[in-house]
Structure formats: C-alpha cells, structure tokens
C-alpha cells in the first residue's frame, strides 16, 4: 500500500519519524502479511479494513473516533468489533461507521449532531455501538459527510441522519438535525446503485444513471445550475444522458465517472480541484478535458483535491489543493489540471516481464482519498491483480434485484424458516417497488441508460420468463409470499406522484405476473393496480401512456383482455357479493382503465378497435334500464332516481312482457306501437 498527504496527527499511519507533509507516495505496510481491503479517511483520522474483516484505526482521537484508547500514527485494532466480520467502513470529520456482513451498522466518535444515529446526542462515543434503529434492515452501503450519514438498504429504502443545517438529509424544509436514521421517502421506488456524501451535500445514483443531489450548494456542488441549497433530492438533469456510474464527493465539490470512462466535475474550484485549468467554481457538470484522451476507471475526492486512475497506462492523475502534499506530485502547490502522481506506475497487463527494473513498478488495485490524505492499494508486477473498475457495479452493494439466483435462495430461506429475520428480509424485498424496478433492465447496448418519459428501459420478455418460472410448483411457497406482498404492501404503497420515471416501471411489470390474469385475484391484485394507475398525477399518467404506446401489440392486447375479463367477472353476479360502494369503485376502475388504453390505441393502433368490445355485457346488463338511470342522473334528477327506480323497472318489465305477447300473436308493427309501455309511449308514461 502507498500513501501520501498530511500526517500531523499520524492519520496516514506512516510513522512518527516522518515529516508532517508527505508530498509523494511512500510505501506503507503497517501489518505484514495482512491484506488491506479498504481505507476510509476522516478529517484527521484513518480507518483500515482488512480482508479478514478486522478494523484498525490511527490519527486524532479527541472524540473517540478511533474506537480504542490509543492515538497516533500506529494503527491499532478496534477490539469491540473483533466479533464482527466488517465489510465496509466510512468516516466523517470526527466519526466513523462500520458495516458488518450481516447488514448491521456500528458507529463511534463525535455525536453532537446526531451523526452516530444512536438516538441520543452524545459529544463522544469511544466504543463502536450498534445502530439499533436499522436492525430490521439489511444495509448494503454507508457514506459519511462531515456531520451526517447516508445508508442504503437491500430493499431500496434510503436512510439519513445527523446534521441538517443545509438540508443534507433530504427530509424537506425546516427539518432539524436527526439523531436516528430517517427514511428519505422522496426517492421511493427508484432502484439505487450508490449513495455518496460530501461535506454537507449528498447524492444518490440510480441503476440507470439518474443523479439526485441535495444539501449545501454554495459553490454549485449539486450541479443544478445555481448556488441555492436544496432540502430534498433534485434530479441533476444535465447528467441524465451521460451514463453516470459512480460519484465521489469532496467537501464542496463533486466528481462523477461515466460508463465510457469520462469524468465530470462541478462545485468549488478555488484550489483547482475541478481540473478545468482554472480556479473558478462551476455550477454545471463540466467534463475534464485533460482526461478526454484517456479512459478513467476510478475516481476519488479528498477535501479539496481529486484523483483519477487510467488503467491503460496504470497512471494516477491528481489535481486541486496540494499544500499538504495530498496530490503526491512531489510538490506542495495547488494544481488546476490533472497531473501525474509521482512514482513508477505500470498497467496490469503492461510489458514489464524481463525488464531489470520491473520490481520498481507499482500496479494499482484501488485508490482511496479523504481529508488531506490519499491511499493506494497496489502490488508488484509479479503478484499483480487487475485494478478494480468503479464502472462495474458490485451487485452486493446496490438495491437487491429479483432474478433466478435470488428466487432460489429465497425459496430455500422460506422453506427452512430458520430465522424470522431471513423471512422478513425476503418480504421486504418482494414488497419493494425499487427492487422490482431495477430487476429487468434492458442491458442490450445499455438501453436502460436511455430511460425517459418515452422509454421504460426494461426487458419485458425477461420479466415474463422469470414470472413463468415462479409459477412452477417447486416455487409455490415463494409464490404465496409474493402474492401476499403485492396485495398487502407493494400495490397499496404505490405513489400517485413517483419521484422519477425509473420508479414507474412497476406499472409495466406487474401485469406480466400470471395471477393478475386469474379471476381469483381480480379483487386483490388486478383492480387495485388499476386504481393505483388511475390515481397517478397528470405527468406520470402521460408517461405510462407513452410507455404503453411503445410496448408490443401482444403485451397491449393482454392488458386489454385482462380488464375486459375483470369487467365480465364483476358483472357476473359479483354485484350481489360486494357492498355497492366497492362494486361501483371496482367496475369504474376497470372501465376507466380500458378507456385509458383505448385512447392510447387510437393513436398507435396496437390492436383492432373491436378488441375492446365486451359482447357479454348485453346478456349481463339491462342496457335500457342502465341508460335511463344514467339519463336521469345526467338530467340532474339524481335526487328522485331512487323514487322512480321501482316504477321504471315495472314499466320496462311491462314493456318486455307486452313485446313477447305481441310477437306471439304475430301482430303487425302498428299494433305493437299501441301497446302501453312500448318504446313510443314509455316517455309519456314516465311523464
């Protein structure tokens, strides 16, 4: 491992005999024969996670941020975490957080702003404690700002806590700081790939590259074209088409990495940390032109500096504040354009074999930065491994997806019932719109990155295949749980105002589930879904219309037939089994949804118009009676409808009887016209 930067408190762990400022990479191996997996840097402390799950810390310890009683440059193990297998660590200015392989979070250090999430406000916590508020969640990611934290759960729920002076918690206006994790409901339904915290600003990244930012924006670090703080997540529209796959935040600047290896930066630029050959702030995302000839695979931001790794050459480039040696260029001055970090670097597949000086070269594995320090995991040529690629999302770190592999695992968990937590986790994921929305992405030529009000970005064929697999008898226990989850949680919780188009894919996915076509589930699934669709606000409703116009005719016809079937089902005797208000709401929902589909079909001609016919209606509904009842309502006579209803029915019955008698006697049309109650006299009788 190599490290460089500011070490006045020993936080880089290089040793007390070295200078306060380390301006170029120094080899560092604090634990021989032990592999470091991750490094997190706080304001003046560092946390090291080993491959075996142990955690070591060093640096300043005034608030207990090291989790043990020692202080200084020598890393010491946190004994309180020895019984846990830690898989991820993060640091704030003076606090630390660790994530276990069981999805539990532990925090310690400064807590005066609630940043530890322990419910109580404490100035300093010297021993790691479990964040109990998240005990029912399986946490996958955690990120720390200076005095706040963000956490992403497996079911897509997103939590924040700590200081909220600038709205960095995303909980809305006038919300005070929070000492316990709070759910950010405004991102519900969006399948998230990453959460990232800056000094006092926050970001969330969706699986399809949508970027949402909020919090402090005094330097334009949210990329929203202004310098106004935001209290709730806001879509960074200028990045929507860039296929963003990773975000890193400094104190007041932000860097994003695209799938093609491009780097965009925005926010504070006073130290050159944006890499635009200037010291100006940028309120809009702007590509780092100096890196355009290279494909970048890793980025990392410190307090006021930025790093980028180019795998083809093995080089690390740095720019921004260098007064504390944090750029590793060998100098202590600010740099406003990407500059090579000093050292012997080589690509993983570089041609070093046989060279006499091959042992001098370092092969980068992973770069880390924070505060005024930088760490690089690397290896010698003969033992080198490919560098990590931040553009390849680690599936264990983002919103859980439903696929062949996961349904087999969940089926086994439900069969064993060895833990109520295991069952609860399955239920949470199956009930999550975010999990379903991210599960069937159209990955062919990255089509899902084009998700928009006109393009859903999902592969409905893969949806159908997975659902058909679930219908096999071997998955019956899981199927039962899915049905319960849809009925009790997922459909009732669908919002009338989804936060983004990515949260709307669920409306295309659910009708593909075979039980929706089964009349046994019309009341519990099919019709509630129709009601949820009809509750959508104007804009999301138009988005769904656009998406329906893009689907294949076969899918569209199934949807039409589904709700035609629901209408027939309701009219076939269900009126007497349901209370009137329920029957009325269900039949109205089915018919209005068919009307909505018909309007779409008029524009795109998915199916012939006669596919909307419901022939059974003529035998299930007395059209004449129904029409006259409707006519009276329309004429403003609703108040007397009930009084005349029985007379109306008697007259209609009388007309039918007389009509039958007339036909039996083979009377001519003139005689039929004179029969009391016939159509020519009906309005007169009513008068």
List the model feature ranges, each with a label.
Residues 3, 45-48, 57, 95-98, ...:
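Conserved core positions of repeat-based scaffolds
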Residues 386-656, 687:
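Extended low-complexity, proline/serine/acidic/glycine-rich cytosolic segments
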Residues 2-22, 56, 60-74, 106, ...:
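Short glycine/serine- and acidic-residue-enriched loop/turn motifs that recur at repeat junctions
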Residues 315, 321, 331-346, 351-398:
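Blade-level signature of beta-propeller repeat domains, shared across WD40, Kelch, NHL, RCC1
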Residues 18, 32, 40, 82, ...:
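Conserved loop/turn at the beginning of each blade in beta-propeller domains
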Residues 40, 48, 79, 90, ...:
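Conserved beta-strand position repeated across blades of beta-propeller domains
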Residues 251-253, 268, 294, 299-313, ...:
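Loop/turn-rich, solvent-exposed surfaces of beta-rich toroidal or solenoidal domains
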């Amino acid at each position: 491992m190599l490290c460089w930067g500011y070490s006045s408190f020993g936080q880089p762990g290089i040793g007390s005999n070295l200078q306060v400022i380390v301006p170029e990479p120094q080899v560092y191996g604090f634990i021989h024969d032990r592999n470091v997996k991750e490094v997190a840097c706080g304001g003046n402390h560092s946390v090291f996670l080993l491959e075996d799950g142990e955690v070591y810390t060093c640096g300043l310890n005034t608030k207990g941020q090291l989790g043990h009683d020692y202080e200084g440059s020598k890393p010491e193990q946190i004994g309180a975490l020895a019984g846990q297998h830690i898989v991820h660590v993060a640091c704030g200015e003076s606090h630390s957080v660790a994530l276990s392989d069981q999805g539990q979070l532990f925090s310690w250090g400064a807590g005066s702003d609630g940043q530890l999430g322990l419910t109580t406000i404490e100035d300093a916590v010297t021993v790691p404690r479990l964040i109990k508020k998240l005990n029912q969640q399986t946490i996958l990611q955690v990120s720390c700002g200076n005095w706040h934290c963000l956490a992403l759960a497996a079911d897509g729920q997103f939590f924040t806590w700590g200081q909220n002076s600038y709205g960095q918690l995303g909980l809305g206006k006038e919300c005070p700081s929070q000492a316990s994790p709070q759910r950010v409901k405004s991102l519900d339904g969006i399948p998230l790939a990453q959460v990232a915290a800056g000094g006092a600003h926050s970001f969330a990244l969706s699986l399809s590259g949508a970027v949402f930012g909020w919090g402090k924006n005094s330097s334009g670090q949210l990329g929203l074209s202004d310098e106004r703080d935001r209290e709730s997540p806001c879509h960074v529209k200028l990045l929507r088409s860039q296929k963003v796959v990773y975000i890193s935040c400094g104190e007041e600047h932000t860097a994003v990495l695209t799938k093609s290896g491009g780097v965009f930066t925005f926010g504070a630029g006073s130290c050159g940390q944006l890499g635009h050959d200037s010291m100006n702030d940028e309120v809009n995302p702007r590509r780092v032109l100096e890196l355009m000839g290279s494909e970048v695979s890793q980025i990392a931001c410190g307090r006021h500096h930025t790093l980028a790794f180019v795998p083809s050459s093995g080089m690390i480039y740095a720019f921004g504040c260098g007064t504390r040696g944090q750029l590793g260029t060998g100098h202590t001055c600010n740099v406003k354009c990407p500059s090579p970090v000093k050292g012997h670097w080589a690509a993983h597949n570089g041609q070093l074999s046989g060279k006499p000086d091959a042992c001098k070269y370092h092969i980068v594995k992973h770069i880390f930065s924070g505060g005024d320090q930088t760490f690089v995991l690397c290896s010698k040529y003969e033992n080198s491994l490919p560098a990590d690629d931040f553009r390849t999302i680690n599936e264990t770190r983002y919103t859980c997806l439903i696929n062949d592999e996961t349904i087999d695992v969940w089926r086994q968990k439900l069969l064993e019932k060895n833990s109520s937590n295991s069952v609860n986790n399955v239920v949470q994921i199956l009930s999550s719109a975010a999990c379903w929305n991210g599960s069937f992405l159209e990955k062919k030529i990255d089509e899902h990155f084009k998700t928009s009000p006109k393009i859903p970005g999902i592969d409905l064929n893969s949806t159908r295949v997975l659902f058909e697999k679930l219908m096999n008898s071997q998955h019956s226990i899981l199927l039962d749980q899915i049905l319960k989850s849809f009925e009790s949680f997922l459909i009732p919780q669908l919002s009338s105002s989804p936060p983004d188009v990515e949260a709307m894919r669920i409306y295309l996915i659910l009708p593909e589930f075979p039980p929706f076509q089964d009349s046994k589930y019309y009341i519990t699934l099919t019709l509630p879904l129709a009601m949820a669709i009809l509750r959508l606000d104007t804009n999301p409703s138009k988005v769904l219309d656009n998406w329906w116009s893009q689907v294949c005719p076969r899918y569209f016809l199934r949807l039409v037939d589904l709700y035609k079937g629901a209408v027939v089902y309701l009219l076939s005797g269900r009126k007497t089994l349901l209370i009137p208000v329920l029957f009325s709401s269900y039949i109205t929902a089915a018919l209005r949804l068919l009307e909505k589909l018909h309007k779409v079909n008029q524009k795109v001609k998915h199916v012939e118009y006669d596919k909307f016919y419901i022939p059974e209606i003529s035998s299930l509904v007395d059209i004449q009676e129904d029409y006259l009842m409707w006519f009276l309502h329309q004429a403003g006579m609703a108040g007397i409808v009930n009084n005349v209803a029985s007379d109306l029915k008697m007259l209609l019955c009388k007309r039918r009887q007389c009509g039958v008698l007339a036909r039996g006697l083979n009377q001519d049309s003139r005689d039929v016209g004179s029969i009391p109650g016939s159509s020519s006299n009906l309005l007169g009788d009513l008068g």
